[in-house]
From Swiss-Prot:
Protein name: Zinc transport protein ZntB
Main location: membrane
Membrane topology: Multi-pass membrane protein
PANTHER family: CORA FAMILY METAL ION TRANSPORTER (EUROFUNG), ZINC TRANSPORT PROTEIN ZNTB
Gene coding for it: zntB
Pfam families: CorA
Length: 327
C-alpha cells in the first residue's frame, strides 16, 4: 500500500489533522509528512464546512460509495468493509447544554491501517477523552488501538447517561412510595430517552461485536479482545435499559392508581359532606318556599330554635355516619 503525503489531506477548515507518532502522541500534520501504517493520519472534519465538503467530494483517497456516507447520509450505527478500508457509523451522547443528551450525535469514519477520516456536524464529546490522551502522549499508537479507544470512550459516556437515567428512576420510585407524583410529562420524557438509547445502542453493540469478530488487518487479537469487552459492557447497559423501560411501565400504572385513589378520596369526601348537609338543606328550602309564611317567623326565638334544630340534625347525621363506619 502506497504512502500518502500530508499535502493530500490538507483541508483548511478541518477540525484538526494530526499524525500519530506511534508512541501514544500526535503532532500537527504538515504537507511534507509521509503517512503510513507506522505513522497513521487522523483527519477530523465537520462535513458542513465548505472546504471539508469539497475535499470529501473530490479526494481520490476515498471510495466513491463512501463519500455520501461521510457527508451525513448515514445515521444508524453500522459497519461495512469497503475494499481495504472500513466504513463505520457510531452514535454518542450529546454533550451540548442546549439540547437533551438523548439527542445523539452521529460520527462517521472511514479508516484503514494508515488513514482515518472522521466526520461530524455537532461536537462529539467522547472524542475529547481520546484527544486528551493523545496530547498527553498516552493515547493510541496505531489505527486499531485508536478505534478501540474511541469505542471505549463512546461506551463510557453512554454508560454514564444510562446510570443517570437509572438514578432518576430510583428517585421516582422512592417518591411514589411517599405518594409524591412527578410533574406532568416527566415520566414520558424519561421513557422516551430510554427508548431512544435502546434504538441506537443496540445496533452499536452489534457494530462492536462485528469489529471484534472481523479479521481486519489493522486490528490485533488484543484489539479484538478489548472490542469484545466493550460490546459486552454495552450489552449490559442495554439490559439495564430494558429493565428501566419495564419499570417505567410499572410506575405509570402506579401513578395512575395513586391519582385514581386520590380522586376517589375527594369524591368520597364530597359525598359525605353532601350527605351531612342534605337534611338541613331540605329543611331550609322547605321553610323558604312556604307560601303561607315561614313557621315561627313572628316569634323572636324562632330563628334561634331553627338553628339549634339544624345543628342537632347535622350532629345526628354525623354520629350515624360514624357508627356506620362511613367516617
Amino acid at each position: 500500500m502506497e504512502a500518502i503525503k500530508g499535502s493530500d489531506v490538507n483541508v483548511p477548515d478541518a477540525v484538526f489533522a494530526w499524525l500519530l507518532d506511534g508512541r501514544g502522541g500526535v503532532k500537527p500534520l504538515e504537507d511534507n509528512d509521509v503517512i503510513d501504517s507506522q505513522h497513521p493520519c487522523w483527519l477530523h472534519l465537520n462535513y458542513t464546512h465548505p472546504d471539508s465538503a469539497r475535499w470529501l467530494a473530490s479526494t481520490p483517497l476515498l471510495p466513491n460509495n463512501v463519500r455520501d456516507a461521510l457527508a451525513g447520509e448515514s445515521s444508524r450505527p453500522r459497519v461495512s468493509r469497503m475494499g481495504e478500508g472500513t466504513l463505520i457509523t457510531l452514535r454518542c451522547i450529546n454533550g451540548s447544554t442546549d439540547e437533551r443528551p438523548d439527542q445523539l450525535v452521529a460520527m462517521r469514519l472511514y479508516m484503514d491501517e494508515r488513514f482515518i477520516v472522521s466526520t461530524r456536524q455537532r461536537k462529539v464529546l467522547a472524542l475529547d477523552d481520546v484527544v486528551s490522551d493523545l496530547q498527553e502522549g498516552t493515547g493510541p499508537v496505531d489505527c486499531g488501538s485508536w478505534l478501540v479507544d474511541v469505542c471505549d470512550a463512546l461506551t463510557d459516556h453512554a454508560s454514564e447517561f444510562i446510570e443517570e437515567l437509572h438514578d432518576k428512576i430510583i428517585d421516582l420510585e422512592d417518591n411514589l412510595l411517599d405518594q409524591q407524583i412527578p410533574p406532568r410529562g416527566f415520566l414520558a420524557l424519561l421513557r422516551k430517552q430510554l427508548i431512544v438509547m435502546r434504538r441506537y445502542m443496540a445496533p452499536q453493540r452489534d457494530v462492536y461485536a462485528r469489529l471484534a469478530s472481523e479479521r481486519l488487518p489493522w486490528m490485533s487479537d488484543d484489539h479484538r479482545r478489548r472490542m469484545q469487552d466493550i460490546a459486552d459492557r454495552l450489552g449490559r447497559g442495554l439490559d439495564e435499559i430494558d429493565a428501566c423501560i419495564a419499570r417505567t411501565g410499572i410506575m405509570a400504572d402506579e401513578i395512575a392508581q395513586v391519582m385514581q385513589e386520590s380522586l376517589a378520596r375527594r369524591t368520597y369526601t364530597m359525598s359525605l359532606m353532601a350527605m351531612v348537609f342534605l337534611p338541613s338543606t331540605f329543611l331550609t328550602g322547605l321553610f323558604g318556599v312556604n307560601l303561607g309564611g315561614i313557621p315561627g317567623g313572628g316569634w323572636r326565638f324562632g330563628f334561634s330554635l331553627f338553628c339549634i334544630l339544624l345543628v342537632v340534625l347535622i350532629g345526628g347525621v354525623t354520629l350515624w355516619l360514624h357508627r356506620s363506619k362511613w367516617l
